[in-house]
């Protein structure tokens, strides 16, 4: 029986949920995600090269936008500049010999706006000096930033080679413009979106199968069992991933992003701890294909034998509703041109004004899982993020809205963290951020047929 102290704690800590509290089998109303097959490798290469050419065509405009006349990138095999991966052809698996690129904002005398070399002799430097002498760029950007990976990919040894190769006369014209690398990598051309949406649907479909009675056997399956099932499932579909899937049992303790000091005492993903009836489980999961990466976090609930949606603890459903509200808050504050730190500040102020406790840690995604762009909070940095948080939010990119809300669950007599992560894209038609596939608004339910003599406990 729920005592008066527990009830009072619930009333003080609970967030008012205006919508009707429900739970269903699916993740989002009206959506039944299906695995989307990838095209042949040859067709994938055509798609990739087409997207790359679209993006390369944007470079002269980027140079003009940031007031730079030329952009020079150079790398050796297995020591690539980070931006190299946004420029390479689909059938290139690394740089070769010395791979060098020069881009010009406004070439003179009908010259091309870009040049590339794959060379292991002095020819590259001789020809490069000739082009620079003809074009006379006043500024030449190099990717030498010390804090931003997408603007700091020029290796130290290669920088020495560049300075020696082009000569001291050009050294004074070298400049650092970090937004060149950031914006080039961040920009997602429109033709990529349909495939990104298919990839996201596939990720949802794998999660829904993994968090179902098809895969989870209560009392037997462990979190690690489900993680490796997900990994094998990805591989079987000819997709890959950019991180190991994780599955956590949300007990109210031990969730890493919550910085809970009791984590060592209550490991939510201990390999020998089976998933049990009544568990609230969470996954962080992504798939990779076609030079793109997804990033998703969903939660599910393990019903007791014979239970239905109506038996899900209401506090858990309310927790999901609360984190949905936090998603709305962050998405509405993501104004193009604002810095990540400004968005973080506005979002946290609104979050607290609505009585929500949680954390916000959003990042760009797409080309890389943690891709180029501003950062909106980190799990350990909720006031501001140095350097990365000071970058402006760009349009025409993808973002992972990653966060959690805390909610007191009276049926467990404890506060539980409710994490969520969904990807969004910039939509020019609505001038706003839209979910790539959707967002989780209903708990995933793991069902078990009724067992004679077994009933769910009334108190946990």
Predicted segments, located by residue:
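Fungal secretory targeting signals
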Residues: 1-20
């Amino acid at each position: 029986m729920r005592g008066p102290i527990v009830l009072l704690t619930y009333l003080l800590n609970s967030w008012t949920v205006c919508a009707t509290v429900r739970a269903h089998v699916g993740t989002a109303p009206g959506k039944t995600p299906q695995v989307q097959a990838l095209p042949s490798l040859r067709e994938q290469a055509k798609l990739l090269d087409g997207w790359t050419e679209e993006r390369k065509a944007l470079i002269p405009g980027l140079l003009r936008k940031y007031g730079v006349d030329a952009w020079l990138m150079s790398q050796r095999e297995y020591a690539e500049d980070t931006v190299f991966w946004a420029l390479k052809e689909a059938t290139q698996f690394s740089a070769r010999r010395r791979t060098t690129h020069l881009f010009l904002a406004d070439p003179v005398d009908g010259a091309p706006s870009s040049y590339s070399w794959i060379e292991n002799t002095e020819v590259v430097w001789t020809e490069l000096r000739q082009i620079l002498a003809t074009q006379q760029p006043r500024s030449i950007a190099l990717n030498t930033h010390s804090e931003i990976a997408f603007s700091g990919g020029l290796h130290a040894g290669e920088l020495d080679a560049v300075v020696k190769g082009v000569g001291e006369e050009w050294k004074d014209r070298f400049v650092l413009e970090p937004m060149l690398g950031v914006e080039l990598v961040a920009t997602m051309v429109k033709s990529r979106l349909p495939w990104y949406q298919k990839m996201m649907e596939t990720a949802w479909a794998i999660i829904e199968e993994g968090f179902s009675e098809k895969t989870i056997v209560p009392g037997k399956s462990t979190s690690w069992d489900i993680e490796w099932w997900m990994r094998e499932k990805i591989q079987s579909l000819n997709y890959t991933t950019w991180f190991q899937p994780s599955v956590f049992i949300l007990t109210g303790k031990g969730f890493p992003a919550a910085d809970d000091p009791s984590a060592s005492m209550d490991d939510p993903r201990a390999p020998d701890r089976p998933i049990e009836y009544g568990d609230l489980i969470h996954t962080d999961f992504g798939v990779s294909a076609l030079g793109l990466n997804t990033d998703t976090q969903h939660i599910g609930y393990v019903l007791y034998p014979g239970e239905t949606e109506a038996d899900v603890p209401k506090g858990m459903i309310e927790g999901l509703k609360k984190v949905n509200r936090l998603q709305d808050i962050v998405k509405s504050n993501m104004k193009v041109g604002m810095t990540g730190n400004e968005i973080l500040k506005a979002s946290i102020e609104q979050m607290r004004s609505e009585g929500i406790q949680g954390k916000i840690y959003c990042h760009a995604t797409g080309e890389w899982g943690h891709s180029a762009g501003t950062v909106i909070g980190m799990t350990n940095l909720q006031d501001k993020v140095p350097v990365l948080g000071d970058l402006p939010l760009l349009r025409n990119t993808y973002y992972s809205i990653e966060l959690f809300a805390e909610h007191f669950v009276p049926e467990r007599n404890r506060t539980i963290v409710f994490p969520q992560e969904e990807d969004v894209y910039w939509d020019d038609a609505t001038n706003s951020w839209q979910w790539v596939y959707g967002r989780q608004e209903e708990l995933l339910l793991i069902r078990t047929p009724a067992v004679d003599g077994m009933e769910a406990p009334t108190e946990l």
